A protein has these predicted regions:
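Short, surface-exposed amphipathic charged segments that create phosphate/polyanion-binding patches used
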Residues: 71-74, 126-133, 177-182, 204-206, ...
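Internal helical hairpin/lid segments
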Residues: 226-317
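Glycine-rich, charge-decorated loop segments at or immediately adjacent to ligand/cofactor-binding or catalytic sites
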Residues: 97, 171-182, 225-228
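Metallocofactor- and cofactor-centric catalytic cores in central/energy metabolism, strongly enriched
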Residues: 1-130, 144, 148, 154-157, ...
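Short, conserved secondary-structure transition motifs
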Residues: 168-175, 255-258
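A conserved active-site cap/scaffold subdomain adjacent to cofactor or substrate pockets
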Residues: 165, 183-251
Length: 368
């Protein structure tokens, strides 16, 4: 299949592995940011192909995983109301809050519905004028423009019964936090291609310059990731720190200007708490005051309450590249996709879920 098979070409993949092997004179620690990249690495055993030359650790690029417990609890509170239709993407239903999850709220009679587009939520509001329809808007810069468009459309139609519980986060501030940590191990980053398709790659230049760290914008197929690893290895071996774009078939320096403009109209940058990590300055998006009539937090008067993560869940350390899922004593025993302790196990993009699906015994699980 064109635009797919060539990025899974075993001959090309083997060539990249040989290049990494020939370049590396010492083991380097690299972090892929996006959860989709993590799943590709696990599915195809890319970490094993470069073992001894490169150690791959996994970053906080799973939006479901970093949505704080407090925000999940707000969603649960709204979803349990009899006058509300609560609308969400499917992967949020099993994410644990402090006491329960949306799936259980639905099982107990809450009107919780799964959609594949935020515009579906707008249609539900249009079709149910007597009910409050709340869309759970979660995601990075990739999904934020579509959510912004839903809010724009709701304002255009003057839909009084539509609102959004928004929990959007931004990638560069999270990378800055990791690099600024005194226990940071990461020496190079594979930046998320889908995020950069929207935002462009220029905003990563400041990180390269401030921390003298190489960053390569990478794609999501096996040869994309192997080429990105080779590019980072070459930079590190040569003592360079540059921003490079491996995913040039999708990413430009400036990104999608129209999408960025829409984000600027609907949202403003704000501090945001990340699950297990804490508050990161200027790392999120909140609705501008002009969109307050569609802001679920304001409409329902939700209060912030501090909630602690389960003590045995180490997903916060996994998301910062300090631990791996197999280091967790609860992995695949007390924590599984059916009974997750943390969001990294239940999300379709979570690192713990990737290890459980492909590598739960420490060896690659055969996948057809």
């Amino acid at each position: 299949m064109k635009y797919l098979d060539e990025y899974r070409d075993p001959v090309l993949a083997a060539a990249f592995v040989r290049r990494i092997d020939s370049l590396s004179t010492r083991p380097w620690v690299l972090m892929e940011i996006c959860g989709g990249q993590t799943h590709t690495i696990m599915r195809y055993g890319i970490d094993d192909l470069v073992k001894g030359k490169v150690e791959l650790v996994h970053g906080p690029g799973c939006p479901v995983c970093v949505t704080p417990v407090e925000m999940i609890d707000k969603a649960l509170e709204i979803a349990a109301r009899p006058d509300v239709i609560f609308v969400s993407y499917g992967d949020m239903l099993r994410v644990p809050g402090s006491k329960t999850d949306l799936f259980e709220v639905k099982a107990k009679g809450g009107d919780v519905r799964i959609v594949y587009s935020p515009m579906d939520a707008v249609k539900i509001a249009r079709d149910n004028p007597s009910r409050q329809v709340v869309f759970f808007g979660v995601g990075f810069e990739t999904t934020a423009p579509a959510n912004a468009m839903a809010l724009w459309q709701a304002r255009l139609e003057r839909l009084p019964n539509f609102s959004m519980l928004a929990s959007h986060v931004l990638v560069p501030p999270a990378i800055r936090l990791i690099l600024g940590s005194p226990v940071n191990r990461v020496q190079g980053f594979i930046a998320p291609g889908h995020v950069c398709t929207i935002m462009g790659c220029s905003e990563y230049e400041a990180l390269v310059n401030d921390f003298h760290v190489p960053i390569v914008v990478g794609g999501f197929e096996p040869t994309d990731l192997l080429e990105s690893i080779a590019m980072l290895t070459a930079q590190l071996e040569e003592g360079r720190a540059e921003l490079e774009n491996q995913y040039a078939r999708s990413v430009t320096r400036s990104g999608n200007i129209a999408a960025q403009n829409l984000l600027g109209i609907v949202f403003e940058v704000a501090d945001r708490k990340w699950r297990g990590i804490g508050k990161i300055p200027l790392s999120g998006l909140r609705l501008r005051e002009e969109f307050a009539p569609w802001d679920a937090e304001k409409i329902f008067g939700l209060e912030e309450a501090e909630v602690e993560e389960p003590a045995e869940c180490i997903s916060a350390l996994v998301l910062q590249g300090l631990k791996k899922p197999l280091d967790c004593p609860a992995f695949a025993t007390r924590c599984s996709p059916d009974h997750p302790l943390g969001a990294s196990m239940v999300s379709s993009e979570g690192a713990c879920a990737a290890y459980h699906q492909y590598k739960r015994h420490g060896e690659l699980v055969n996948v057809q």
